[in-house]
Amino acid sequence: TDSVSTSSTPYTISAVADKTVLKADGTSLSYVECTVVDENGNMVPDADNLVKFAVSGKASIVGVDNGKQESAELYKYDNVDKSSYSERMAYNGKVLVILKSEKEAGDALLTISSDNLKPVQVALKVTENGTGDAPKAAEVTGTEKSVDAVNVTVPTGMSVTLPSVVKVNYTGSAGDYSLLKKVTWSEVKDGKAEGTIEGSKLTAQATITESDDAATDV
């Protein structure tokens, strides 16, 4: 029987390159299809994150696209023929980046990132004749660093609704990044609450302030 998987909070980007070994001729292309996915690898079809691309080594970026015909975004970032950086909004959860080899053999590394998503890297190899073993897949690792504190002001005497997610910050092998994670809060006591974060060893902290001024806000 067919089953349908539903996506949840965007977590990272799945990146698939049609080629990971390019010829060092300055014209060989690799098309890297990027998909915003949740923690279970399911596509998030309504994701419209601004996706950022940075490449180092013996390749450059020559184009980005998201399939949205009415988009006013540039196919070539900053209108330059090739660059080491580009960016594009995802459309229906997807975005494409096109890499081109340089004329020198060597390695290349593409880093793909977006706010509140775990970054991903794609390793490529540029060889004299365009053949050879594919490079080892690049794996991004991260270590929890901190949780953004939650501060809420409510009208005096009113109950408070705390956010369902908090921002957890990481130090990673591809640079620092942040993820939004679900949180379950304790009861508010003396204007404070602690949160248990799903999939995290850290604890969230919330401070609730009552204000007569807040009661007059519209």
Predicted segments, located by residue:
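Short, solvent-exposed loop/linker segments at the N-terminal edge
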Residues: 21-30, 150-160
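Edge beta-strands of extracellular beta-sandwich domains
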Residues: 2-7, 118-127, 216-218
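Proline/serine/threonine-rich low-complexity linkers at boundaries of modular beta-sandwich domains
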Residues: 2-12, 132-145
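Carbohydrate-binding surfaces of carbohydrate-active enzymes
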Residues: 1-10, 14-24, 37-39, 47-49
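Short, hydrophobic beta-strand segments
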Residues: 80-103
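Beta-strand-rich structural segments
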Residues: 27-45, 51, 110-112, 162-172
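Serine/threonine-rich, repeat-prone extracellular segments and beta-strand-based repeat modules
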Residues: 173-218
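Short aromatic-acidic-glycine turn motif
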Residues: 10-14, 53-76, 130-135
